[in-house]
Amino acid sequence: MERTVFLNGDFMPEGEAKVPIFDRGLLFADSVYEGFGILDSQIVDYEYHMNRLDRSLGELDMPWPMSRDDLLVAMMTLIEANKAVEGFLYLQVTRGSRDRSYLYDDDYQPTVFAFT
């Protein structure tokens, strides 16, 4: 059975999730990630991890891909969809996709994906 994953606001079977080859996360590792423990279908130390994600995004001058509240709803929906009682949730945010260039501006639309 395929897992449900989250990509840019949508939930889908893992086999349908596609990230463009020109995404800066792939080309330049221009991304941040955070790992969340899951226990009793709840996120362990949620605030700690979200604060660390905030710090990491800030260090790379990357915007949040969505509000913290919306991200929490997405993560909890993902946990429920995959019936994850104990485990791990991986979340990654990239600067986004555009033609390959070392330079970037504030116009990028971040890519966000997560899976359990």
Task: Provide a role label for each language-model segment.
Residues 1-116:
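Conserved alpha/beta cores of soluble small-molecule-handling proteins
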